[in-house]
Structure formats: structure tokens, C-alpha cells
Amino acid sequence: MSTLKLTLLQQPLVWLDAQANLRHFDMLLESIQQRDVIVLPEMFTTGFAMNAAENALPETEVIDWLRHWSVRTDALIGGSVALNTPDGAVNRFLLVQPDGTILRYDKRHLFRMAGEHHHYLAGKERKVVEWRGWRILPQVCYDLRFPVWSRNQQDYDLALYVANWPAARAKHWQTLLAARAIENQAYVAGCNRVGDDDNGHHYQGNSVILDALGEIQAQAEPGQAAQLDAELSLETLQAYRERFPAFHDTDKFLLL
């Protein structure tokens, strides 16, 4: 498939109330049709809380919920959630396909300014999922500030960033998303939440979908709940990469 229909759900989150959040997304997903990828924000069941894992749903329950909507919408669907594992709590990006195939990516870069590294385990493995002819890289919030993690090989066409990124640093969010698109010659989508959390942080969203030149393909109204839709062209992306093959001059390196 050369065209990918992408949807981002920029929404408020109820603090530490997974069932309320799932009911809210149920209402939204009920009306979504004919999309290929649907993305929810970071920690979409709880909000970005350091004790979210104490209130976490079992992973099987979250996967069953995502699978239900993946089948109903015939789309790859996902976002990140706080989960408990035998080794400890993780901030895990789950992407589920209609046939039940699951990709799990654990957030690599934990936000130490909130003490996330004291409550969650850092992911160790970068993941790419192939879906309908597209290669998709899942990333979570603070990962955005570390370009090496998304730069070491040209193995994806679309990077998905899910976040709880406060309004106080909105300029960084917008600038870094564009930088990741330009330097990696890939589509980049950032799905952020809106509203206020119980720690006093305000979120204005600024969810956006960018092409490989850093040009805006779709952008949500700041501070408003929104469904953001765009159609991405793999042929356009490949033509640009061939026309401007900067990756051939990239410095090669390995992640240790």
C-alpha cells in the first residue's frame, strides 16, 4: 500500500482512572472508519503518573481492548501504557494488528526530571513494525530529545511519537519533531494529550503530522480535543529520498 491513512487522537486523560479513559476512547473509536493506523497518547489509561503502575490494568486486558478496536477499524492501533512486568514497571508502547500480532516497545529514555527512572525500567531494544508496506518506528515522549536512538539506520518510513508533553515546553516539541523528520527523511507524527493533570501540568497538545521535509501535513488546534487525520504517500517519500539521497553520507555507528 503506497498510501497510509493515519489518525492521531489528541485527548484529555482522567488521572489514574483506566476505565474512564477507555470509555472515553471507546466513544471516539466508535465513529472511526477506513483508517490504517490509529494512535493514542502516552500513558493513555492513566496519565503520566509515577505511581501509574500501581493502578495499571493487566497487559492482557489492554491488548484485548486494543485488539477489539483493531478488528473493528481494520487498523493498526496503539499508544503507551504503564504496565507491571515480572522485572518491574514499564512505560510500554503497544501496537496491535487485527490478526492479533503485537509489537511491544518499552520507553528507552525515562524523564528523570519527574523521577520516571526511579519508578520504571528503561527499554533496551528499538523496534520497527511493518504494516501494509510501511515500516513504522514507535517512540515515547522523552525519546524525542535523543536523535541517536532514531538515527542509526534508515529502516523506517514513519516515526510515531506518543507523549504527555507539557505546554511549558511546547516549542521544543514542535522543533524536535520537525528535526527528526528532516534529518531522518521520514514522516513523523506526534500525538500529545491535552488538559491538566493532578501534578499541575498543563498540556496543549500541538499534535502534528509532518512529511520528510518537515512540512505540516495536519495539525491539531492547541488546547482542544481533536481527531487528526492525514494520508501519507510512500511513493512521494521514496521519490524525495532518491532525489535528495543525504543518507548515503551519514556517519555509520552502532548503539552500545
From Swiss-Prot:
InterPro entries: C-N_Hydrolase, C-N_Hydrolase_sf, Omega-amidase_YafV, UPF0012_CS
Annotated catalysed reactions: a monoamide of a dicarboxylate + H2O = a dicarboxylate + NH4(+)
Native organism taxonomy: Bacteria, Pseudomonadati, Pseudomonadota, Gammaproteobacteria, Enterobacterales
Domain of life, per lineage: Bacteria
Record bears the keyword Hydrolase: yes
Domain CN hydrolase: 4-234
The protein's name: Omega-amidase YafV
Task performed by this protein: Hydrolyzes alpha-ketoglutaramate (a-KGM) to alpha-ketoglutarate (alpha-KG) and ammonia (specific activity 21 umol/min/mg), has very weak activity on L-glutamine, and no activity on deaminated glutathione (dGSH) or glutathione. May function as a metabolite repair enzyme.
Residue numbers annotated as active site: 42, 107, 141
UniProt similarity note: Belongs to the carbon-nitrogen hydrolase superfamily. NIT1/NIT2 family.
GO MF entries: 2-oxoglutaramate amidase activity; omega-amidase activity
Pfam families on file: CN_hydrolase
Key words of the record: Hydrolase
Magnesium as UniProt keyword: no
EC annotation from Swiss-Prot or TrEMBL: 3.5.1.3
Protein's gene: yafV
